[in-house]
Structures are given as C-alpha cells and as structure tokens.
C-alpha cells in the first residue's frame, strides 16, 4: 500500500459542479451541473477495491452529496473550530457531542 488514507478536497464537486456562463458578470448566474461521482467511485472501487478516502464535506452539502459519501462508505470531516464560531451552538454538527462515528475530526483547516 502506498498510502494509509487520502483526503479528497471539495468532495461535493463529485456530485455536482457550479457552472457559470462565460458571459455572466457574477457567479450568481451559475447553475449546478450533475457530476458522475457515483459512477466514478464505483468504477475505481471495481478496479482497486475499497478506497481509503476521507471526504472533505464542508461548505454547501446537499442531501445528494451526503448520500454519495454515505453510499460509498467514506467518512466525512468535522472541524472543532467551526463548532465554537457558530451563533447557534446548540444545533451545529461540529460540536463534539454531535459528531457521527463515521467522521474524522480536525482542530482546524488550512483555510482558517
């Protein structure tokens, strides 16, 4: 084995990507375009076996992105710093007592 585990950044892009028309003045004119994530991960697993992947599931995570992660058995990410930066501390999924077993917990990321 060459690696123990790989963190896939911007995992949500495997479900859909934000497409912005070339003539648009701002990104607000974009639309979500489906991506072939499910087919891709099935084919890679078929060829390589189980994948040692952590899905970076931060940002705009839709039920479809969550389903893609769960259906392929990839753990997601929790960031402790996000838990204590929320105005609604009682419901944030980043608080330690709300973490799910299939999660990898980081104190922070390169972005914060």
Predicted regions mapped to residue ranges:
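Catalytic cores of glycan-processing enzymes that make or break glycosidic bonds
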Residues: 1-112
């Amino acid at each position: 084995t060459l690696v123990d585990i790989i963190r896939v950044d911007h995992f949500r892009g495997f479900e859909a990507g934000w497409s912005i028309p070339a003539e648009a003045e701002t990104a607000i004119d974009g639309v979500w375009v489906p991506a072939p994530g499910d087919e891709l991960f099935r084919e890679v697993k078929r060829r390589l076996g189980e994948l040692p992947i952590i899905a970076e599931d931060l940002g705009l995570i839709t039920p479809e992105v969550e389903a893609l992660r769960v259906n392929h058995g990839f753990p997601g990410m929790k960031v402790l710093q996000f838990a204590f930066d929320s105005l609604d501390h009682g419901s944030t999924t980043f608080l330690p007592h709300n973490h799910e077993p299939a999660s990898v917990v980081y104190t922070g990321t390169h972005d914060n």
